[in-house]
Amino acid sequence: MKTTFHLKYDSRWGEELCLTGNAEELGFWKPENALPMRYVDNGYWSVDVELNDAETIEYKYIIKENGHIRWEMCENRCWNGNKSVWDVFDAENMEKMVGVAVPLFSLRSESDFGIGEYPDLMNLADWCVVNKLKIIQLLPINDTAAHFDWHDSYPYNAISAFALNPIYLNLQDLGVEVDEVFNEEQNQLNALPFVDYPNVLKTKWKYLKTAFAQQWEKLQKSDEFNSFFAENEDWLVPYAEFCARRDVNNTTDVKRWSEHAGEGCPEFYYFLQFHCDRQLREAVNYLHSNGLLLKGDLPIGVNPQGVDVYSHPDLFNCNAQAGAPPDDFAEEGQNWGFPTYNWAAMEQDNFAWWRRRLQVMARYFDAYRIDHILGFFRIWEIPKGVKSGLLGHFNPALPLAKDEIEAFGFQFNAEKHMTGKLETLFVSDSYQKDRFHPRIALQKTDLYKALDEEQKAVIDRLYEDFFYHRHNEFWKQSALSKLPALIGATQMIACGEDLGMIPATVPEVMQQLGIKSLEVERMPKVFGRDIVQTEDVPTNCVFTTGTHDMPTLRAWLIEKGENPTSESIKTVIERILYSPACWNIFPIQDLLDTDESNWSADPKDDQINVPANPENHWKYRLKLSIEELIQQYFCEIK
């Protein structure tokens, strides 16, 4: 049986990857007889081999370099009979790295304008060097300007999956004249304890337009601009034209655009994106010169009224809304309002839109967080017009026919058990009206409570099978049909946000593709645990104290009834540091809270996002400037 082994390994010059094992075809564990692998692209190696599927095959990868042999440190791998095997080189060989997670908008420096800016990453890099940190992780930094109000502070609702956000441009670097009015506006915005996103955007826009008027004629003739334009024309032109028409129509709702409003000025957006790219790449080069990695964030959704949906409507299901099932942070689930993806259409060109999106990200980032990686297995889909996440269902899915429900022993009555409201036991499938999904958290409904004990037991068994067993292999194959093309599109290191209602096959697929998992101390994945135990932590993961969707460590300890001190916070962080995890990336709030002099009066103010609040203002900002932190704060974590 012909089998292709694929290995994800970012090799160094002079290294040769080989495959060996307990079969004659694999060289009987002798390095001199091991099969050489060929480098394919983007960190992937492969080799074809004929194997006998009747035998138990064990194997390992080895590295040959200048006559030396390095073996994997893991247990022998076992071939499962698949025609295509995807592996990652043993994570024990990975360097232990520690980093900081902070939204770009939260940074504060002596030169910014009410919000963190691209050049501030260089100041942050200096602070990281002082504190021996190696990774900076950001929230998404794509353009979100749909309304020019607080809604645009939400970084996961970008109007373009490619364009950077101009709000992070440093005005002085653009040559904006610094006069008395400029200083006054800058000082007013910087005096605030939070990011006043709408006013920052409005005020900066005024200066950006002035800079464009003064500089565009010369810039458009420069080699630097024309090189940037040629490299990014495919996404830049539709984005700029979309933004220009948004401006003249005062809306991103294309249904309300007038043919008589004109085309606007797309050149303004060429200008902005050129400088966004220039400033960010300058910062990234500085990070790299100091040995730091920059980790980005790949949002699961796009704005339903953004340029991506406008330009590629066939790639999106605009009659559906993406979200998440209920959890400890949102009892009714979440409705993000994003369209879901038409994966069948995307697969026709081998996911070109996704691959290009990642290639553009790779201009700046060394690693990336796959937001809601579960969405690549299945997404929680809510019909358009429905608000509550409780009435959603997974897509793709294997919904139940009426006779299947009855085969479990449940006396199904559509009129009685499907009201179309929250008080329902089943919801109809959006694509097959004669198929049904058990309503998520149906045990909390009055309809369930009114059932007799026998029928409760039946529907509990049906519910358990549907959500935790029925789809395992189906969702595994769903993910494997998409993720390899995406992961292989660049050399960036992929990390998955695998929190929430996790299908059993998710860890298997992530391990197979070499995607780092996410472990959060207060969200154990082992049943019965209160917190994550270090012995449960895999090596190939990011282990942390929390995320932007959670209270800070200090706030969480208070919620638990504890009285945290700087020492108790250090103890938690140090325990995580001494885990097997190859990466630890901590929210900057938790690192700063190891010094009580830096504590906020109310730790709730330090939480970046409250998932249960769709109107959340993303406005958290550091109390101290990065320059002050470099002088005053030194991380004491050992």
Question: Language-model features: where?
Answer:
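Aromatic-rich carbohydrate-binding modules that target alpha-glucans
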Residues: 2, 10-55, 64-85, 113
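Catalytic cores of glycan-processing enzymes that make or break glycosidic bonds
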Residues: 48, 78-638
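Extreme N-terminal starter segment of soluble prokaryotic enzymes
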Residues: 1-4, 97-98
